[in-house]
Amino acid sequence: MEASSGTAGPAVLLLILALLLTESQGSRSQGTHTLRYDVTACFLEGSEQTRLLVLIYVDDELFLRYNGDRRSAKPWACWIKGHGGDETCTREAENLPKEEERLREMMADMINQKGHDKGPYTLQATLDCELQRNGSTRGFWHLGYEGRNLLTFDQKTLTWTMDVPFTQQKKTFEPRAPKADLVKTFLDETCPARLQRHLASLSNVLPDTGSPVVIVTCRNYPVGRITLTCRAFNLSSRVATLLWLRDGKPVQQDVFGPGTILPSGDGTYQTWVSIRVLPGQEPQFACNLRHSNRTIMQTAVSGESMGWPSASWATRQEAEGPHRTHNDHVVDGGLVTGNANKDSPDASSCATASAISAFPVVVLSVALPRAN
């Protein structure tokens, strides 16, 4: 998308609507990378100006934020700032005015057709490409109106398809949609090339997170059950396996957790997994973390600390407050807060929580999953 002229007014209203028909991270295979643009344009009644906001994601994590009023993009992830982020932002800012102009024209046609009966109106565009492990690519381009999908580009037929509720408006919107050859070029070539460039940039800004930290806590219940919870912090990528072992063998029964690796917001990742056991069985269980070519084993109950969290993790805890309180079971990274999860552990209600950090740490070359 090349730069073009167009003027956006003062930032009076920026609306961020639900993402349009994007795939969840869990449906993507390991080694797949994605680049997605979520574009929202708002037209205010009685005004000829458009307010535009673009959120740019790499591997489903907010990467850059573009403000159409200022025609500028800013790095969103704090660990990107100061590491080539300005150059990346400038390049992205040069690419977006064309899409802004296209949405403005579509919106003007829509307003004229509806006769200015209400406002504000919003149009959305989602541009998404995937880079597979084997080097193949695929892409998605959706246009939406008022938070509902309006047009979807079919890469097989190279045509735009429209949802049933908007069939009567097809003559208004479809002529303003991007031409098929431009969409195909963007999804097949431009977007994957940008994604590869972003991944290359990110490979140079991986923060020194220190060692992974594994913490095991437990909680007693009056009914005679105990919940053991294993938490892993300071993960340098989403590629990690955390599981419970009983006498050295993996356990699946009575195990629960988020089932995914979650971002901590500082360039690191975290996750947790819990298991319900009977009193006295604790010594039979151990938590196993596999991450960055290392395996960390932590027993369920050791009665004493097995190591120290890394410096960066400890510093973050000191700045953000206690990781765990009686009423706020987990506040770091927002995994579980307050009493939302009745099975969330309270370290004070069972044996002393134990922690282990692995040394030496093996740091990956990028902060995102890389194909083997």
From Swiss-Prot:
Could you tell me the membrane topology recorded for this protein?
Lipid-anchor; GPI-anchor
> A Gene Ontology molecular-function term?
natural killer cell lectin-like receptor binding
The free-text tissue note of the record is: Ubiquitously expressed in neonatal and adult tissues.
Which residues are connected by disulfide bridges in this protein? C78-C89, C129-C191, C230-C287
Please list where the region (Alpha-3) is annotated. 211-339
Superkingdom of source: Eukaryota
Keyword tags: Cell membrane, Disulfide bond, Glycoprotein, GPI-anchor, Lipoprotein, Membrane, Signal
Q: Where is this region: Alpha-1?
A: 28-119
Q: Region Disordered: what ranges? A: 308-349
The record lists glycosylation at N134, N234, N293
Gene Ontology biological process terms from the UniProt entry: gamma-delta T cell activation; immune response; immune response-activating cell surface receptor signaling pathway; response to heat; response to oxidative stress; response to retinoic acid
Classification via PROSITE patterns: IG_LIKE
What's an example GO cellular component term for this entry? external side of plasma membrane
Instruction: List residues with covalent lipid attachment of type GPI-anchor amidated serine.
Output: S349
- Which residue ranges does the record assign to the Ig-like C1-type domain? 192-302
Give the transmembrane region(s): none
Role according to the record: Binds to heparan sulfate proteoglycans on the surface of fibroblast cells.
Identify its protein family: Belongs to the MHC class I family.
Q: What is this protein called?
A: MHC class I-like protein MILL2
Q: Which organism is it from?
A: Rattus norvegicus
The UniProt gene name for this protein comes to: Mill2
